[in-house]
Amino acid sequence: MALEITDGSFTPEYTRDQLELIRQNSDQVLPDAEWGRWTGYPQFFKDQDWNDMLIGNGNMQNYNVNISGGGERYSYMLSLGHQREEGIPKFGEDVNKRYFIRAKSSVEIFKNLTYDLNLAYEASNRDYSSGLTEGQNIWELIYKTRSWTPMYNPSGTFYTFEGFDNPAQVLEDGGMVNKTTGNITVNNQLRWKVIDGLQLVGQAVIRKYDMDENVTNKKITNYDWDNNAVREKRTPNSAERRYQKTLSKNFTLYADYKKNFNDRHDLSVMVGTSHESENYDRFTAKRINFDQQENMSLQLGSAQDQNAWSEGNQWTINSFFSRVNYTFANKYVIEGTIRADGSSRFDPDHRWGWFPGVNAAWRVGEEGFMKRLGWFEDLKVRASYGEMGNQSGIGLYDYIQLISLSNDYYPFGAG
């Protein structure tokens, strides 16, 4: 047999009778015995497919209602949706409920004035076992579990072998996460056709994200084959409350003028400004050592074992931009651009940068001699020069000098 060593170099781990039980995939259990590194544990022979015992098939349901209509000067669309998704674990809970609202409308307020609205809202509520995301990786724990380890002892309690947590018990009894999120985006746009060829466009986009997460991590008791409690794991128990909110704003205003003169001269001029900003805040409160685990509200935890921390940041980019484009006879093109960007990532005295650009093009393919040759359907020669800024890799507050705190010195610099 492949599992049998007969040259005397090792002490046999299994007898011939035990190897036969393995071959038969027997569910027979032998009492505690000396069997190598697992001395003191019962001896098992039946192979267990832990992946199959723990992981099932997810389920997803989708419901949608759509309404649309309009008239001569307006149009609208409304979409409502609900999605319920059940995760793949067979133990514990993993249910995610999501709700959607999508709305679009366009209204011609006056003959030359149009307002467009695009709204999107999504809310979700997910309840799932904290064993999926908190503490030890549950998939690593499944991998470490011996394939012949039973899930339950004869008393029907989750069985623990070799000191490793039972993955099913972690999912079922290890605690819960309740995560609620809300995400809304409102996009407003106003277009005014002032005169022939000239329009003003204003756009305001607001995005708001909120998250409220309640996390409990519970102690679990390990039981041996005789249903004796042998140890407590995942201690101390704990509860956390996490809040997060993000508010993003993007405002743009620009004028765009396009005019053709005598069918040979095309002029396009655009000038505008924009503002983009984001505010982020996050707060977490935690308590540990709860006397009971039925209700793990924060106020019921130990006041001596509590932590609270927060973080937040804010950034802004303001810009001015302009572009002038002139085309003659649809063959000769020259264009100039310039923009100024001010970023909050830089010191106030060095916050702004100016970035010009120019390019020229010759559509050789439109020349009569090139058309007669018939070599190319389209051929363009182009040359350009431009400057651009880059703030990637620069932290939000890198320009601010750090302050060192000490118990013995004034907290300024390194002195």
Regions of interest found by a model, annotated:
Residues 1-47, 83, 87-185, 201-318, ...:
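Surface-exposed loop/interface segments of Gram-negative outer-membrane beta-barrel transport/assembly proteins
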Residues 1, 17-18, 54, 62-88, ...:
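Predominantly transmembrane beta-strands of Gram-negative outer membrane beta-barrel pores used
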Residues 348-352:
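Short glycine/threonine-rich loop-to-helix capping motif typified by GTGT followed
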Residues 82-86, 334-343, 385:
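Transmembrane beta-strand segments that form the barrel wall of outer-membrane beta-barrel proteins
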Residues 62, 186-192, 206-208:
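Alpha-helical support elements that line or immediately flank enzyme active sites
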Residues 117, 356-360:
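One face of beta-strands
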Residues 66-70, 104-106, 189-191, 203, ...:
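Transmembrane beta-barrel domains of outer membrane proteins
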Residues 54-58, 312-313:
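Short Gly/Pro-enriched turn/cap motifs at secondary-structure boundaries
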